[in-house]
Amino acid sequence: MNGFFLPRRMGRTALLRYAALLDGQTVNLHAELPAFVTEAETAEIVLRRGLRRHRRPARVYPDLEGPWLMDAAVLLGAEAGGVPVRRGRWKLSLEVRSGRRSVRLPLTLTEPTTPRKGATGPMARSPLTAQRYRLGRTVRGDARVVCTRIRPAAEVAAVHVQHARIDVDLRVLGVRATAPWAEVVAAERRVRCPLAEVQPGVWRLEVPLSEMVPAGGGREHWDVMVHPGRGAPLRLARRLHDVQAPRRVFTMRKILVSPRRGVLMRIEPRYTAAGNFRFACADGDRAE
């Protein structure tokens, strides 16, 4: 359908040359305005869904060798101080004003922007709320932002590795944490742990090292499950980032501790390939 509508609309819409959501919550736009726009004083990006409208400023300027151009960066999400968009599809348009005259232009997206590959990449979700936004287009080629349901998650905020202690700060997203608590879970063992709120929305887990000594002097892996107080438990992970090689970038030092009298244990906090947070515990006398 795009192949039918787009040729007939060229010259009457603002053509997006760049459109991307890089940090999971900011829409970056660069567009070429139609030739009939020869002057402009102010401009705004308009997000529309049904009767709801949200406006954010845009920059328009003349190109020395071509049509007028537009740049805009639109932050999404009330929690981030941005546009309070909710679930649904929000159509994007550009309103240009000059004196008392104004014109509203559809923002046409012919091809989605392909981000460059590098050490970082586009984020699929907002780092603050885990809300998922994506750029799409209608059958007529109009650009739109699609806001979908938040998937509940437990996200690592910080890991404090000390001489003989490890604390983990975490956030619970997408579900209300009424009275959260955590469990560290190995193959055949579970240890319940309290969580203390150290900042609004940030909870701290004091890792129970004395309960995590490997049985039989072997090696054990412990995952962390967070119980938000309602709903299913959430596996603690770190996924809200733009790093392409997180296991290499987010490495943490291993420490040798004596959680019990006469017992040595080597413990290493780490991330799995899927981003799950895990502790690898081994006998301190045998581990390298």
Give residue spans per PLM region.
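Basic, ligand-binding patches in group-transfer machinery
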Residues: 1-288
